[in-house]
């Protein structure tokens, strides 16, 4: 009886490993906004025009003046 229970437990752990359980928010995929680069935080961003100078704009994601 105990060996059958051990085999069943082993099979269950192989089919459903503990690593697939979600952790407590320490994964980067759970917090995409915190790790995204903002155009306002970029040194090339012009606060009055609300965009970047044209030659530099291609490197800034989601820049309002370049699309």
Swiss-Prot record:
Residues 23-50 form a propeptide. The cysteine framework is III (CC-C-C-CC). Classified in the M-1 branch, since 1 residue stands between the fourth and the fifth cysteine residues. It is found in: Secreted. The modification Cysteine amide is found at residue 66. Expressed by the venom duct. Residues 1-22 form the signal peptide. One of its GO terms (cellular component) is extracellular region. It comes from the Eukaryota. Keywords: Amidation, Cleavage on pair of basic residues, Disulfide bond, Secreted, Signal, Toxin. Disulfide bonds join 51-65, 52-63, 57-66. Belongs to the conotoxin M superfamily. Its main location: secreted. The lineage of its organism: Eukaryota, Metazoa, Spiralia, Lophotrochozoa, Mollusca. InterPro entries: Conotoxin (IPR004214). GO terms for molecular function: ion channel inhibitor activity; toxin activity. This is Conotoxin reg3.8.
């Amino acid at each position: 009886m105990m060996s059958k229970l051990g085999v069943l437990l082993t099979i269950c752990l192989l089919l459903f490993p503990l690593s697939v359980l979600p952790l407590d928010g320490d994964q980067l995929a759970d917090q995409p906004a915190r790790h995204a680069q903002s155009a306002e935080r970029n040194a090339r961003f012009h606060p009055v025009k609300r965009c970047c100078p044209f030659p530099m704009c291609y490197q800034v994601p989601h820049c309002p003046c370049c699309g």
